[in-house]
Amino acid sequence: MTSNSFPVFDGVSNKYDNNTFYGRYQNFRDITDPSTLFATEKDLSQSKTLLDNFKKGLVDPVKHSDELWKAKKILDSTIHPDTGKPIFLPFRVSAFLPINVIICAGLILPNASIGTTIFWQWINQSYNIALNHANRNASNTMSNKQILEAYASAVGISCSLAVGLGWGVNKLNIQNKTISSALRMMVPFTAVTSAGIANVLIMRGNEMVNGIDIKDKDGVIHGKSKEAGKSAVYKVAFSRAATSFPALLLPPIVMGLFERTSFVKKYPKVRMPLNLAVIAAIFNTSLPAAIALFPQESTISADSLEPQFRNIKDKNGNIIKEFIYNKGL
C-alpha cells in the first residue's frame, strides 16, 4: 500500500473497489473533481508518458505509485475511454459541477417570468445535449439531423413542462403556503428530469436499435449487442434522474431554513452566494453518487444478450459467460 493507503498501481486494478457503490463513488469523485480542469497540455503529456513508461517496465510502481495514480486521474477525467482523444473541456464530466451550479441557480429562481424559465431550461438542455454527445459510447454514430431532432425534442419537452406546470400551479391558487411551495419546487425537477430522460433516450436511441460494442475480459470486441445498448441507455437515464433529484429539490429546502436566520434577514445580499454554495455542496456529493449507481464498464450476462453471443469462446477456448460494455455517462 502507498502512503495514502491506496493499492500499489499495477495498470489494471482500480484505485477503489468498483464492485461496491462506495468504491465507485470515490472513483467518480476523482473523475468529477473540477481541479483536473486546470491540468495543462504539459500535464496531460507527462501523464501519458509516465503511464506509457510504466507499461514498458521503466517505472517502479512501488516507488512512483502516487504519481501513477495522479497521472491516471488526469487521463480518466480528460480522455474519452473509447476514442482515446481529449474531451472538449466544458463537456468533461469534471466541468459538470461548476457549470451546473450556475444553471441550477437559474432553474430554481423564485417567481421567475416565463421568459426566464424558458431561457434557463434552454441553457440546461443545450448543455446536456452537448455533454451527452461528448461522452457517448464511441460506437454510437449520429447524423447532424438526428442530433438536431434530439436537441429540439429535449428543449421542447423541458420548456413546455416548466411553463405548463408552473402555470398549472398558479391556477390552482393553493392557500396553504407549504403545499404551494412544495409544488413549485417540483416544477423544475419534473421538467428537467423528464427532458433529461428523453434527452438520453433520443440522443442514444440508436444504441438500442443498432447495438453497442461488447468485449470479453481480455478486451476483444465480439460485435454489437442491442440488449447491451438498451442496458447502457436505461442505466444512464436513471442516473440522470438521480442527479436532478437532490440538486433541484434540496437547495430550496435548505435555503428556506437559512432564510429564517437573523443573519440572512440582516444581510439579504448573501442569499445568492449562499444559494450557489448550497447547490455546489449538494452537487459535489450527488453527482458522483448518481454516476456511481452503475459501473462505467458494466457487465452483462451472455444469457441476457442475443443468441449469437451465447456460445462464443475466449482466447483460451472457454465459453464467455459475461461480456463488458461501456455504458457512457
Curated annotation (Swiss-Prot):
User: Which residue ranges run through the membrane?
Assistant: 95-115, 147-167, 183-203, 238-258, 274-294
Could you tell me which Pfam families the record lists for this protein? SFXNs (PF03820)
Source species, domain of life = Eukaryota
A GO term, aspect molecular function: monoatomic ion transmembrane transporter activity
Just give the chief location class: mitochondrion
Q: How does it sit in the membrane?
A: Multi-pass membrane protein
Keywords recorded for this protein, A-Z: Amino-acid transport, Membrane, Mitochondrion, Transmembrane, Transmembrane helix, Transport
Q: Which GO terms describe its biological process?
A: amino acid transport; mitochondrial transmembrane transport
Cellular compartments per GO CC: mitochondrial inner membrane
Cross-referenced InterPro entries: Mtc (IPR004686)
Q: Where in the cell is it found?
A: Mitochondrion membrane
For this chain, the family text in UniProt reads: Belongs to the sideroflexin family.
> Its function?
Mitochondrial amino-acid transporter that mediates transport of serine into mitochondria.
Q: What is this protein called?
A: Sideroflexin
What is the organism of origin for this protein? Dictyostelium discoideum (Social amoeba)
